[in-house]
């Protein structure tokens, strides 16, 4: 009976393809197994920078949230008048200017009184 592991359909193993402990058999460097540690300090520095950056971003977001909480926001339900009396009081507080101040504005104006009236969408 034939051994199935030695069947002719299985690929042949070439010496160059044999890898032991993650390294090829031809590796003559006795420290090849430890070469991943070669750049360990650089890797640690990079990870530390990423952690500092994440912490900085987190602090920025926290400060931004605190500023938003401190800021006085316009809330219509709270800030707009609710009753007709409040609206009437605000309306009464409005000052109606007299016509003499309007005449002063016209006299001091730099506008051309002979200019055509501006109408949006009309080309002259």
Swiss-Prot record:
PANTHER family: POLYADENYLATE-BINDING PROTEIN-INTERACTING PROTEIN 2. Acts as a repressor in the regulation of translation initiation of poly(A)-containing mRNAs. Its inhibitory activity on translation is mediated via its action on PABPC1. Displaces the interaction of PABPC1 with poly(A) RNA and competes with PAIP1 for binding to PABPC1. Its association with PABPC1 results in disruption of the cytoplasmic poly(A) RNP structure organization. The keyword Ubl conjugation applies. Residues 22-75 are annotated as: PABPC1-interacting motif-1 (PAM1). One of its GO terms (biological process) is negative regulation of translational initiation. Ubiquitinated, leading to its degradation by the proteasome. Keywords: Cytoplasm, Translation regulation, Ubl conjugation. It is found in: Cytoplasm. Pfam families: PAM2 (PF07145). The gene is PAIP2. Residues 105-120 are annotated as: PABPC1-interacting motif-2 (PAM2). GO terms for cellular component: cytoplasm. Only the PABPC1-interacting motif-1 (PAM1) interferes with the binding of PABPC1 to poly(A) RNA and translation initiation. Belongs to the PAIP2 family. This is Polyadenylate-binding protein-interacting protein 2. Interacts with the second and third RRM domains and C-terminus regions of PABPC1 in a 2:1 stoichiometry. GO terms for molecular function: mRNA regulatory element binding translation repressor activity.
């Amino acid at each position: 009976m034939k051994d199935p592991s030695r069947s002719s359909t299985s690929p042949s193993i070439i010496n160059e393809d044999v890898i032991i402990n993650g390294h090829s058999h031809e590796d003559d460097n006795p420290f090849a197994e430890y070469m991943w540690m070669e750049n360990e300090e650089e890797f640690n520095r990079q990870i530390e920078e990423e952690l500092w950056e994440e912490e900085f971003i987190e602090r920025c977001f926290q400060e931004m949230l605190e500023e938003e909480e401190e800021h006085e926001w316009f809330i219509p339900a709270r800030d707009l008048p609710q009753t007709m009396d409040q609206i009437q009081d605000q309306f009464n507080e409005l000052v109606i200017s007299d016509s003499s101040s309007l005449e002063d504005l016209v006299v001091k104006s730099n506008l051309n009184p002979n200019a055509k009236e501006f109408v949006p969408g009309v080309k002259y």
